[in-house]
């Protein structure tokens, strides 16, 4: 037993980490032989992976930088757009329409609205935005209509009302209110003339006893606020100054008064001495530079001092010197007023800056008047007597109800009883430049209106309203505008955007038949 125990030998336990079996040595040697190649391959793969990671990282950085640049570009574009919108003001759509109308080669005028009235419509007036329409007639009532729903067709004419008109006339007027043309409890008087505030705050009305009544139309509608008393006969025409603080009135007493609406006093008096006043029209403000001075207005109308030897002056030398001295004194007064110190700088800046409309309205000093006997006068607020006087030409009957200026303010068109429209140029003497003849059976010309392009003239005769082309040289030079037929036209009006035209039929207290209808037309330019 001892021998067996002595002979027995025990091997120590070996862990795999401590040693390998002999047969594993060869495998280990083989593995060692293979490992260098695998290590090289692994190193290459690791290098490739690192390179790919570096490339992807670079691409990510590039993408981030590109995104940042795009964001910066967008921000700069937005800021530049904001600056452009802030620097460049938005275009006024009304100015676009005016520009389009002034350059139009043709106007297509189609009647769409009719307001029948059982009285002679002597006058009508609009607010500046065409929101409200005021009409006055022989029955002694002033009516107020809502224009936009009317022209949009919210109320249609009945079958009986549509019968006298063409097929395009389907819309009727929407009446808002009406009131009597009277003051201090007097009997209602026929409305001979109307003038409305641009925003509809008040309306002026001419009465048969010579008064001019001012009605409130926005607050206490139809309330007679005051009455201007100076005329002794019916006030046949009213013309608001551009500032809407003054008004010209003409009457059957052959007098024209210039009123201050703030005080109710007559500033100036103009005696026509020839006949009942039938029309008063201010010279267009576009005829002069709207940013110029009063002397520019005079020079554009009557020539320049530098060319006094070459042009036909309408004033003599003494009058020209007086006007120059007056304009110099006015300019000196303006300079003294601007030199006066003020309380704050902001108020001085606001006082000195004027809008184009305000500055141009302050310069509308020249106007024309026509008398029922056919005589026409051109006046200036800075002079007592008329600047120009156009007598009735030989062979022409003594009758004139309307006259108008051309858009540039250099020509005057006046309608005659014998169906002729005479054209005068204020720089070329007192004889008509040419005569536009209507058909023999057309009747007297009761109203004329010049279109914004200066090429077309709207002429209303007893039979029809015509659109006359002043540049036509052969053939018939006019087109008949459908709608009106068989009556005198008391008033014609084209809105500032040249999208609508309006006509009213009335005799204004003189002899003549009427259709007793107010018509509205839509104008399409081309």
Swiss-Prot record:
Region listing for Disordered, in residue ranges: 1-98, 327-364
Pfam family, one: Beta-prop_SPT8
Cross-referenced SUPFAM superfamilies: WD40 repeat-like
Keyword Transcription included in the entry's annotation: yes
Keyword Plastid: no
An individual GO BP term: regulation of transcription by RNA polymerase II
Gene Ontology CC: chromatin; cytosol; nucleus; SAGA complex
Biased composition (Polar residues): 341-364
InterPro entries reported for this sequence: WD40/YVTN_repeat-like_dom_sf, WD40_repeat_dom_sf, WD40_rpt
Compositionally biased intervals (Basic and acidic residues): 31-43, 79-98
UniProt WD repeat ranges: 116-155, 186-225, 230-271, 348-389, 395-434, 440-478
Compartments where found: Cytoplasm; Nucleus
SMART domains according to UniProt: WD40 (SM00320)
Top-rank lineage group of the source organism: Eukaryota
Bias kind Acidic residues: ranges: 21-30, 44-78
A single MF term (Gene Ontology): transcription coactivator activity
Keyword tags: Cytoplasm, Nucleus, Phosphoprotein, Repeat, Transcription, Transcription regulation, WD repeat
Family: Belongs to the WD repeat SPT8 family.
PANTHER family referenced in this protein's UniProt entry, alphabetically: AFR153WP, WD40 REPEAT PROTEIN
Summary of the function given for this chain in its UniProt record: Component of the transcription coactivator SAGA complex. SAGA acts as a general cofactor required for essentially all RNA polymerase II transcription. At the promoters, SAGA is required for transcription pre-initiation complex (PIC) recruitment. It influences RNA polymerase II transcriptional activity through different activities such as TBP interaction (via core/TAF module) and promoter selectivity, interaction with transcription activators (via Tra1/SPT module), and chromatin modification through histone acetylation (via HAT module) and deubiquitination (via DUB module).
Subunit structure, as described in the record: Component of the 1.8 MDa SAGA (Spt-Ada-Gcn5 acetyltransferase) complex, which is composed of 19 subunits tra1, spt7, taf5, ngg1/ada3, sgf73, spt20, spt8, taf12, taf6, hfi1/ada1, ubp8, gcn5, ada2, spt3, sgf29, taf10, taf9, sgf11 and sus1.
Name of this chain's protein: SAGA complex subunit Spt8
Organism from which the protein derives: Schizosaccharomyces pombe (strain 972 / ATCC 24843) (Fission yeast)
């Amino acid at each position: 037993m001892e021998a067996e125990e002595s002979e027995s030998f025990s091997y120590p336990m070996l862990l795999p980490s401590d040693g390998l079996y002999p047969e594993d040595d060869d495998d280990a040697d083989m593995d060692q032989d293979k490992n260098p190649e695998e290590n090289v391959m692994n190193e290459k793969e690791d290098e490739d992976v690192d390179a790919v990671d570096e490339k992807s990282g670079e691409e990510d950085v590039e993408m981030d930088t590109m995104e940042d640049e795009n964001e910066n570009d967008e921000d700069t574009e937005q800021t530049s757009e904001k600056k452009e919108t802030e620097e460049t003001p938005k275009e006024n759509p009304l100015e676009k329409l005016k520009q389009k109308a002034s350059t139009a080669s043709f106007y297509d005028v189609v009647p769409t609205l009719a307001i029948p009235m059982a009285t002679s419509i002597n006058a009508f007036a609009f607010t500046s935005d065409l929101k409200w329409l005021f009409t006055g007639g022989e029955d002694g009532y002033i009516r107020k209509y809502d224009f936009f729903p009317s022209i949009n067709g919210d109320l249609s004419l009945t079958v009986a009302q549509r019968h006298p008109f063409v097929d395009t006339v389907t819309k009727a007027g929407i009446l808002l209110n009406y009131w009597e043309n009277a003051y201090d409890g007097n009997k209602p008087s026929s409305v001979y003339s109307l003038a409305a505030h641009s925003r509809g705050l008040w309306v002026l009305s001419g009465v048969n006893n010579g008064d001019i009544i001012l009605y409130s139309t926005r607050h206490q509608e139809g309330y007679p606020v005051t009455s201007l008393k100076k005329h002794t006969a019916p006030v046949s025409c009213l013309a608001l100054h551009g500032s809407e603080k003054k008004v010209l009135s003409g009457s059957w007493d052959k007098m024209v008064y210039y009123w201050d609406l703030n005080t109710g006093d007559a500033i100036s008096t103009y005696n026509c001495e020839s006949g009942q006043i039938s029309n008063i029209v201010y010279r267009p403000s576009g005829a002069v530079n709207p940013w110029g001075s009063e002397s520019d207005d005079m020079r554009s109308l009557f020539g320049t001092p530098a060319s006094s030897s070459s042009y036909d002056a309408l004033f003599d030398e003494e009058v020209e010197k007086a006007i120059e001295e007056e304009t110099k004194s006015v300019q000196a007064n303006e300079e003294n007023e601007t030199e006066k110190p003020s309380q704050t700088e902001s108020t001085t800046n606001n006082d000195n800056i004027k809008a184009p409309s305000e500055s141009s309205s302050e310069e509308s000093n020249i106007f024309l008047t026509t008398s029922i006997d056919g005589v026409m006068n051109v006046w200036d607020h800075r002079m007592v007597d008329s600047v120009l006087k156009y007598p009735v030409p030989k062979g022409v009957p003594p009758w004139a109800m309307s006259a108008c200026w051309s858009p540039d303010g250099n020509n005057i068109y006046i309608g005659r009883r014998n169906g002729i429209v005479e054209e005068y140029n204020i720089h070329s003497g007192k004889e008509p430049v040419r005569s536009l003849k209507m058909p023999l059976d057309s009747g007297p010309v009761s109203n004329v209106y010049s279109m914004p392009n200066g090429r077309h003239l709207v002429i209303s005769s007893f039979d029809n309203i015509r659109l006359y082309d002043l540049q036509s040289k052969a053939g018939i030079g006019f087109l008949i505008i459908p709608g009106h037929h068989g009556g005198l036209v008391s008033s014609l009006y084209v809105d500032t955007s040249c999208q609508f035209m309006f006509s009213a039929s009335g005799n204004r207290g003189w002899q003549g038949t009427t259709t007793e209808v107010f018509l509205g037309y839509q104008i399409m330019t081309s």
